[in-house]
Amino acid sequence: MNLRPLHDRVIVKRQEEEKVSAGGIVLPGSAAEKPSQGEVIAVGEGKLLENGERRKMAVKAGDKILFGKYTGSEVKVDGVDYIIMREDEIFAVIE
């Protein structure tokens, strides 16, 4: 199944969770922090402005991004976890 985000929404695949702490302690899945990095999988057409024009998206598929730990809505499609968020919830693109 393919997902196509609408308007200024972005579909992101979260980076894998860290299983070992900085001190070398193995963390169970429930104790590991949600990573705030991911890869953009798909982007919408852009935000519709009041004058009827669309603002071009600043990110594209394949970009690595930083975002808040509790940003967006989590969905599971074909056994894969994704986050759907608005473009303005993205903090930065990792270059």
Swiss-Prot record:
Highest taxon listed in the record's lineage: Bacteria
Swiss-Prot/TrEMBL keywords: Chaperone, Cytoplasm
GO cellular component: cytoplasm
Keyword presence, Transferase: no
GO BP terms: chaperone cofactor-dependent protein refolding
Keyword check for Lipoprotein: no
Subcellular location: Cytoplasm
Pfam families per record: Cpn10
An example molecular function term from Gene Ontology annotations: ATP binding
PROSITE patterns per UniProt: CHAPERONINS_CPN10
HAMAP family: CH10
Role noted for this protein: Together with the chaperonin GroEL, plays an essential role in assisting protein folding. The GroEL-GroES system forms a nano-cage that allows encapsulation of the non-native substrate proteins and provides a physical environment optimized to promote and accelerate protein folding. GroES binds to the apical surface of the GroEL ring, thereby capping the opening of the GroEL channel.
NCBIfam families: PRK00364.1-2, PRK00364.2-2, PRK00364.2-4, PRK00364.2-5
Family designation: Belongs to the GroES chaperonin family.
Oligomer and partners: Heptamer of 7 subunits arranged in a ring. Interacts with the chaperonin GroEL.
The name this protein goes by in its record: Co-chaperonin GroES
Species name: Dichelobacter nodosus (strain VCS1703A)
